[in-house]
Amino acid sequence: MATNGHFASIGNSASDTTAYEHGVQVIDENKEFNPNLSQYLSLENVTPSGFNYHLISVFGSQSTGKSTLLNHLFGTHFSVMSELERRQTTKGIWMSKNKNESSSMASNILVMDVEGTDGRERGEDQDFERKSALFALATSEVLIVNIWEHQVGLYQGANMGLLKTVFEVNLQLFLKDKNTTHRSLLFFVIRDYSGMTPLQNLQKTLMEDMARLWDSISKPGGLENSNVHDYFDFQFYGLPHKGYQPEKFVEETQKLSLRFCDGQRDPNLDARKGEFSDGGVFLPEYHRRIPADGFSRYAEGIWDQIVNNKDLDLPTQQELLAQFRCDEILREVMVAFDETIVPFEDKQSQAARLGEPEILGGLGAAMRSSRTKAVKAFESEASRYHKGVYQRKRAELESKADTRLKTLFQGQLNAAHKSGISEFSEAVTAAVKSGQKKGTGYDFAEIVNEEAKKAVDKFEEVARATVVDGTSWSDYKQELALYEKELAEVSARLRRDEMRRLASRVERWVQSRLGESVGLEFNALGSGRAGGGAPEKGDQPTEKKFWDRVWNVFVETVLDAERRFTDRASSFDASLEEVDVGLWRLRRKSWGVLRAKIDEEMIEGNLLLKLRENFEDKFRYDDAGVPRIWRPTDDIEGIYTRARESTLTLIPLLSKFRLDETSAPPPLDRWIGHTPSSATSADEEDLAPIGGVDEEEGKSLEEEMTIVSDAKRQELTVRFKKAADGVYVEAKRSAIGGMTQVPLYFYGLLLALGWNEIIAVLRNPAYFFLLFVCAVGAYITYQLNLWGPIIKMTEAASNQAVTEGKKRLREFLESSDTGRQAIAMSTPGGSGRGGEEHEMSRLNQQGKSAAADEDVDDL
């Protein structure tokens, strides 16, 4: 004989279906729960079925053929008792899936074979009987009560004690859940039914017994008037004797098996009148609403409460199960969620570490897809559990997912923000440079507006592509407003920068124009002749009006620059305040340019050169601008004195910037104006202080307009006089040199004495050709006006040769004793005219001595 006890270890480690041929022992005889129940359900493909499964338990006395009944009804292989012995076969509680492949039966029927009652092995120990009944009632939809016909009407034989226990634990189980009335089906299968007693009579007897049992149990407050039909439905079926009518038994069990299908309650039947359904046994209200994937965990929790004699609270157990399963499902769906989202999180965090925010392609689609899949997967698996727990855990899942997705969303918007700002700045700069290279006018405001619109459109495109519908954090209006605000700030900064560049270009233009115009005024300074220094038309400029002309040129140039600046700034969409600041800066910068140009022209060397040129113009040229050729009869001293005094009047004139019309400095402070109220410290930091305009500078306008100090004026006067004296001495020499003339008779004497040589030259072709070449060279030299320089160079070379000869002679004499004695006896004095010595290295460009110009050479 084989008993179920032999298979008690099955299911502990095996993972294939053959190991579960006899089912799985859910609870062994030692009241231990088998943790591999979930594995069995998974192998039988019950786990994914959700609520689409049914659980049946069978009760009855020991050795009454419960396992045999189940094997015939459901095709299971529960071990049965040998007919040769009568002892306990089923130990604990076993479970097996329905093997009957009849299409009329419900799918996924799980059958529990409960250890029989009233067995001699346990004797009077009814603890397991009560615990197993409680477990079966807490988990099963249908309770099959297996009794023999001859036991109907008996107390012990008809399992009345067991049924009383069932009624009591039913109230215990569902008392705490008063919102729902849980129902179960008690299906009485009457074995060895002979048919002599009508089944209706047996039903009546059993129902009377049920009513008495219900009335006999202790009921909690509020349920004193309840009856058994409030909690239980009843069905009855009679089976013939298996031993005496085996074929009939098989036939009837097959018919009975067809009733294990989904059914509907017939409202026309009244159980109190003995009207019972003979249709499908699985009504929706019987189902315990425990999803198949959580059944093993639920059953384990139920048994743990039962075996530890704790108050069994099914709603609490359902919540605990829901908590456990929802946590498991949440972790599972988050694994799939992580597979999609983690790569994007890694990319984003790496880009953030590198300081190079990157717009992640496909992020929005991945976020929406992963969130939807996670929520749907969770909903599909967890929605079958306790609604409150499910909703709470779903909210937790959405919160976890949304927290991470929000971070990605914010990071994406941040990347779009930073890259957009950078691209906007680069695009505006590139467009401006392109317009400058083409040489065509460009509208800066239009460029900024177009690029800003593109930047906003791109930002919105990225944001819309990343939005996850149905989430509160997907509203990017605030981020868009911040982005537009920064775009406006960057636009303002670019406009300020462009206006600075415009101002720089205008300043360079002013510098160029002033450099030319003011330079011309200085070049024409004090020209006293109608030659190259005089204007082509009209009268020559008056020296007294020099600063007036400079100021007028300056003001006109700056006004023209202001018009250019204002016209160009209008295309920048600049405000009036920005234009005012730009014009104010332009005037200050322009004054700095003018003052720098004046200082450049008025440095000591340049000014001394200007004074000498002014003096030479007045001294060397007459009033008609014709060069003077000095003769001994000319009033060289008078002309020299007038020219020198006239030039000396320029020194005090140039020392201070004063207008001839007002005899006062120009109104620089009024012309520049007050500092605009909108000017910032950045607008003033690169501006040089101006005396008389900036109070904190400590300089007056008079000091600002002082070009040459008094000490410099005196030094300049002395050096100019020395230079003028040199010019005067040179003029005096040229006049004296012209007094030496060759007598006319000398030319006749030269012709008479050299006649033979003349004839010899004319008759000799070689001499004649040489003479011809010399004549042509002399003519060309005359036409190029080079005779003067040649004569001067020759004279200087000869003088230099004489000087060098004297030097060598002196060195020779100094090297001998006789020479040293002769030198010692000689009187001091120089050689040459007036004691002057001329060296080639000391000649000026006219071939004259540069001794008189030694101060000018300090430029």
From Swiss-Prot:
<dbReference type="InterPro" id="IPR008803">
    <property type="entry name" value="RHD3/Sey1"/>
</dbReference>
<protein>
    <recommendedName>
        <fullName>Protein sey1</fullName>
        <ecNumber>3.6.5.-</ecNumber>
    </recommendedName>
</protein>
<dbReference type="GO" id="GO:0003924">
    <property type="term" value="F:GTPase activity"/>
</dbReference>
<feature type="domain" description="GB1/RHD3-type G">
    <location>
        <begin position="50"/>
        <end position="299"/>
    </location>
</feature>
<comment type="function">
    <text>Cooperates with the reticulon proteins and tubule-shaping DP1 family proteins to generate and maintain the structure of the tubular endoplasmic reticulum network. Has GTPase activity, which is required for its function in ER organization.</text>
</comment>
<dbReference type="InterPro" id="IPR046758">
    <property type="entry name" value="Sey1/RHD3-like_3HB"/>
</dbReference>
<dbReference type="GO" id="GO:0005789">
    <property type="term" value="C:endoplasmic reticulum membrane"/>
</dbReference>
<feature type="coiled-coil region">
    <location>
        <begin position="442"/>
        <end position="500"/>
    </location>
</feature>
<feature type="transmembrane region" description="Helical">
    <location>
        <begin position="742"/>
        <end position="762"/>
    </location>
</feature>
<dbReference type="InterPro" id="IPR027417">
    <property type="entry name" value="P-loop_NTPase"/>
</dbReference>
<keyword id="KW-0175">Coiled coil</keyword>
<dbReference type="InterPro" id="IPR030386">
    <property type="entry name" value="G_GB1_RHD3_dom"/>
</dbReference>
<keyword id="KW-0378">Hydrolase</keyword>
<feature type="topological domain" description="Lumenal">
    <location>
        <begin position="763"/>
        <end position="765"/>
    </location>
</feature>
<feature type="topological domain" description="Cytoplasmic">
    <location>
        <begin position="1"/>
        <end position="741"/>
    </location>
</feature>
<dbReference type="Pfam" id="PF20428">
    <property type="entry name" value="Sey1_3HB"/>
</dbReference>
<feature type="transmembrane region" description="Helical">
    <location>
        <begin position="766"/>
        <end position="786"/>
    </location>
</feature>
<dbReference type="GO" id="GO:0016320">
    <property type="term" value="P:endoplasmic reticulum membrane fusion"/>
</dbReference>
<keyword id="KW-1133">Transmembrane helix</keyword>
<keyword id="KW-0547">Nucleotide-binding</keyword>
<keyword id="KW-0256">Endoplasmic reticulum</keyword>
<dbReference type="Pfam" id="PF05879">
    <property type="entry name" value="RHD3_GTPase"/>
</dbReference>
<keyword id="KW-0342">GTP-binding</keyword>
<dbReference type="GO" id="GO:0005525">
    <property type="term" value="F:GTP binding"/>
</dbReference>
<feature type="region of interest" description="Disordered">
    <location>
        <begin position="817"/>
        <end position="859"/>
    </location>
</feature>
<feature type="topological domain" description="Cytoplasmic">
    <location>
        <begin position="787"/>
        <end position="859"/>
    </location>
</feature>
<comment type="similarity">
    <text>Belongs to the TRAFAC class dynamin-like GTPase superfamily. GB1/RHD3 GTPase family. RHD3 subfamily.</text>
</comment>
<feature type="binding site">
    <location>
        <begin position="60"/>
        <end position="67"/>
    </location>
    <ligand>
        <name>GTP</name>
    </ligand>
</feature>
<keyword id="KW-0812">Transmembrane</keyword>
<keyword id="KW-0472">Membrane</keyword>
